[in-house]
Amino acid sequence: MSSSTDNNKGFEVVIDEGETFNDACLPQLLRLPKQTWPILNAELCERFSYYGIKTVLVIYLTKSLMMSDSDGKAYYHAFSMVSYFTGVLGAMMADSFLGKYKTIIWSLVLYSISEIVLTLTTIPSIGKGNSAGPLIGLFATAVACGNIKPCMAAFGGDQFNQKDTGLISTFFSLFYMSVNVGAMLTMIFVPMIRTDIKCYGSDCYPVVFGVNCIVIILATVSLFLGSPFYVKKEPEGSIMIRVFKIIGHALSRKMKSSEETYHHWLYYAQDKYDKTEIDDVKSLMKVLVMYLPLPVFWALFHQQGSSWTLQATQMDGDFGGGVMLRSDQIQFFNPVLVLILIPAFNIVIYPMFERCRLGLSPLKKMVGGMLLAAVAFAITGFMQIKIQDVQSPPPAPPATMTSVDFINVSPCEVIELNPSSFLKISLPYGQNTGHKIGQSGNRTFKVKGTNCFKKVDFYTNEVTVSLKAGARQTVLLDIADDGMMESTVVDHLFPAVSVTKAHTRVRTFYVPSGNMSDLVHLTYDHVIEKKDSVVVKNFTSYNGTYDFILADEYQLLVRPWNSQNGYNIKLPSENLKLGTFGAYTITLKRPKHQKYSRDLVAHLYEDVDSTSVHRLWQLPQYVVITAGEVMFSVTGLEFAYSQAPPSMKSVLQACWLLTTAFGDLLVVILSVAKPVDGVEKEMFLYGGIMLVVAFIFAVMSYFYTYSDFSGNITTNPADEKEIEESKLNSADSTTHL
């Protein structure tokens, strides 16, 4: 998130000596035209709805529509790209044909319809899991949002008289606050709705999109109810269209004329257009050349909602005590950090450079922002390497040896192997030895079970196990109802994990008592992420293969295959926490000292350590990218507005939107092309591209000559209002993306 508002003089509230803040501000609020309040409410609701979709979008695409991560990223950035491209079209349509009010209200109607389509098609019984319906709804939403983006602030400004500069400043402050409040609220609460409400056995996207749909309908109704009171100005023509006409006419005459020569090709248009207009377009194009490298920054910055969110899905957000930082909720750090870093740069960092006689020009600040973005992606790449540092399974034994893990799955308080031997193994109830290397072949052990069915009893007999050479195996030690000690040998095979998915591996041994069914349905029920439960049907007692499931906290449900009534299960803790890329063994067995029981006790063994990287470790990359945003975006807006004539401000705003759109387009292209394999390599690639572009931009900046338009700026309140509107629109376009 970024904004130029912190440096806008029009946003300052001056409090006379002796006045309290409320004394100074409350009258201003009460004096605002009544028709501005529906506009502010509509803006807050529209921003909430837009970011409510965008915050969860990449997770919805990859986890619900089951797209690959690269395809999910491509569609995410295509959604963003369309909203910024159509922002330019919306501005031209409002200025040339419909006017601002009609453009906004009809776009809100389209917005509402498209979100209804999106909500309905996420319902499994309607959408059938097909991506066509949701994608149509998303595309229409992006078009509607784009049309509104450049119009709402300007329409609000139209409600004031030219002399009400103080009220205009108050309105724009409230407008910017509405944008921020809408975005921040949705980044906090929508992920909670996604995970905490369960419908159709999974994350409740119909409710997520349904809430956003209701909010955008409220925005539409709010704006419509104020219609009788609005000042609705007629379209006056688009300056952007006029710029295109001047450029087109100049190029046409230059190609046709062989006699006339001018020191700049734009002056070929002076037969039809005023020289002042041509000079303004010439100044504009000088700035637009400096815009050419800017899309690369936005290509990196916008991946907070795609690549960084996907990275967060592979990390651990548990703070303990039931407090969870969700993978899409972490995006909230960006707006919070903006509020901290903008004053930090203005009050501390920039003055410190000045005191050291290292003054930073606007272009130098922008280069610094680009370099920080590159550093942020380098951090992201190294973080991905850490996340993907999958731990190895226990070492394989030598060719003539075996590696064995003994587990006590009996109700005995203690099981001892070779109890009279110096090398005896003692296993308390539910405990295991971990993998031990020993001799392979047929091995006979004397096994003693103590306090098995009573608190004072013991059973002893020999068991023979066949241990494979060069293999890892698990030996489960149990006791039969007649008191005979038993053993079951299961191969312990570790399937490789995919580092692109936040999976874990789990195998479960079900060891029932004599009055329980040997064939059951086993369910791993998600606790944190409300995904579809993982159901293993017709599960048998010693099925030792690993299942791949999403890393999460789980409850276990076991019921006989021919019954709806499950067994009571006592877990070792409140839930079973299975970490990313780990490997786990779960045993379900009789309670201690019980021969017959309808209850089961679960024990969890970590066969391979999980890669447990907390989501808070993403905070450094968020701090760096946000610092880069403050240096790049805020300064970029100030640079652009200082280097172009006042008549070209709206064109600069439109072109700023286009740099954002082209940044998204770059991500779409690279996501589809897949020039490198591996997320970490992709992050380093983006960081490398940013470094190269920062160097090119630094060279361009070195040869750039600053212009001074201070003599051309009028103090006409209408002009000041137009500049404030343009700055706010551009700030909105780059702040909450």
Map each language-model feature to its residues:
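Hydrophobic transmembrane alpha-helices of multi-pass solute transporters/permeases
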Residues: 2-454, 461-462, 468-737
